[in-house]
Amino acid sequence: MALRKELLKSIWYAFTALDVEKSGKVSKSQLKVLSHNLYTVLHIPHDPVALEEHFRDDDDGPVSSQGYMPYLNKYILDKVEEGAFVKEHFDELCWTLTAKKNYRADSNGNSMLSNQDAFRLWCLFNFLSEDKYPLIMVPDEVEYLLKKVLSSMSLEVSLGELEELLAQEAQVAQTTGGLSVWQFLELFNSGRCLRGVGRDTLSMAIHEVYQELIQDVLKQGYLWKRGHLRRNWAERWFQLQPSCLCYFGSEECKEKRGIIPLDAHCCVEVLPDRDGKRCMFCVKTANRTYEMSASDTRQRQEWTAAIQMAIRLQAEGKTSLHKDLKQKRREQREQRERRRAAKEEELLRLQQLQEEKERKLQELELLQEAQRQAERLLQEEEERRRSQHRELQQALEGQLREAEQARASMQAEMELKEEEAARQRQRIKELEEMQQRLQEALQLEVKARRDEESVRIAQTRLLEEEEEKLKQLMQLKEEQERYIERAQQEKEELQQEMAQQSRSLQQAQQQLEEVRQNRQRADEDVEAAQRKLRQASTNVKHWNVQMNRLMHPIEPGDKRPVTSSSFSGFQPPLLAHRDSSLKRLTRWGSQGNRTPSPNSNEQQKSLNGGDEAPAPASTPQEDKLDPAPEN
């Protein structure tokens, strides 16, 4: 039941956010989306087809016949299982829907709350609000939450300032008896109660209070824990909840290292200092004993007291400390309210008794005065009554005489009335006979009108059938006209598409023709290169033949006497120079044979005195015959 009330508070905000006109009604399409999101976030299995059936546009579904609240109870809240979903995700869904419409943070960035802080304060408001709609938080709970946030920041506010602030808010909320959530968030955003506090400090304090009240974190902090296998000490971040003691690798709580379940049979004991550790204590469960060490004696005392409180809650069968405290505060407020109401009722009763006493005294004085006036009036009335009696007696005597005369005239008039009555009876008899004849004529006329009405109804039905057939013919004609127009449009689109494809085909043909021309030019270039290559090969062969002829040794001739005049121009080094030039030519010829480039052809032409044939390549035999190096 408590979980259902908490879920209903968040769903109420989502529903009112969808109710734009403030009429208490929301469209079925929006309710269908809301229900689907609730099914998803609450991990309730559902059939999408059945969901569509429930929110049909007709008036046969359960939502149309019963309203959304019975549907919400029957199909959603009755199927919720505690622990099967993450309540924070559910609250985030409802906050997202209501914050888009109702929550407006300062666009200049002067607000004290971030969106996450506003969401957590919204959750805290729902937790501490009354179980009445629209949801409000009474000033006592506002004071309690403010003190919690300020104590988390290690700040203290004077009692006078707090009472002044709450008095201002009470004046704002005096019509409703408390603050709405948007007034509550505006109180934090304005910074009136948080002068000199930074946004980061406030965010950390709100997060700590959120963990304590919503997530039931009784205490958290670093402790040294002794392992069970290696028996070494490691520092861990511990979080104490009513049902367990969890420990993590760091305070971000991303890596859970273990969990210590707590029940009514667990206990906590203080241990003496040993192994270099001080302020030690242990938690004994049914299966294992966990040894821990705090930083100082105060921390150890706080941890042991908090763990004992969690064990006490388990023994009493309670799941949340702050839910129990909230219920106790509510009962105390109700007792104070009853005492105050009883006191006010007693004061009101005493005031009414005093007023009643004063009123009776005034009535007594009035009665005495009225009695004196009544005596005086009674005397006057007695004298007036006597005179009136005399006058009345005289008047009665005169009336008696007039009555005797009237009786005589009345008898004569009665005789005339009897004669008139006899005539009236005869007239009534005639009228009854006439009425009977008129009724018979009326029945005949009614029958004729009924026959006429049946004929008219038949004619109307025939006219309606003819109009229906005419409408069908007109609809058929309109469909044929639309079909003709659509066919004409499709024909025009097809013609445009064919024209576009024709243009694309022409462009493709032009590109193909250009490619063919480029290919033809490339083929011509290849053929020219091949001709040049063949010509170069022929020239190389021709040059090799000439070089082979030049390489034959010159046979010695007949010896002749040498004169100084005959060999005056002979210089032996020139022959060696010629041989080296010949080797160089053969080497250039071999390079030209490997790579017939235009530059090598030009070099060979320059060496051969303008001959177009390239230098022949040297053969392996020639390299073996003349291995002398170049100069």
From Swiss-Prot:
GO biological process: regulation of small GTPase mediated signal transduction; vesicle-mediated transport to the plasma membrane
N6-acetyllysine modifications at: K225
Region (Disordered): 318-341, 397-417, 494-631
Tissue localization of expression: Broadly expressed in the immune system. Highly expressed in T cells.
PANTHER family: DIFFERENTIALLY EXPRESSED IN FDCP 6 HOMOLOG (PTHR14383:SF2), SWAP-70 RECOMBINASE (PTHR14383)
Top-level taxon of the source organism: Eukaryota
Modified residues (Phosphotyrosine): Y210
Primary location recorded for the protein, binned into one broad class: cytoplasm
Protein name: Differentially expressed in FDCP 6 homolog
Regions of compositional bias (Polar residues) in chain numbering: 535-547, 588-607
InterPro entries: EF-hand-dom_pair (IPR011992), PH-like_dom_sf (IPR011993), PH_domain (IPR001849)
Record field: compositional bias (Basic and acidic residues): 331-341, 513-523, 621-631
Modification Phosphoserine, positions: S590
GO molecular function: guanyl-nucleotide exchange factor activity
Compartmental location: Cytoplasm; Cell membrane; Nucleus; Cytoplasm, Cytoskeleton
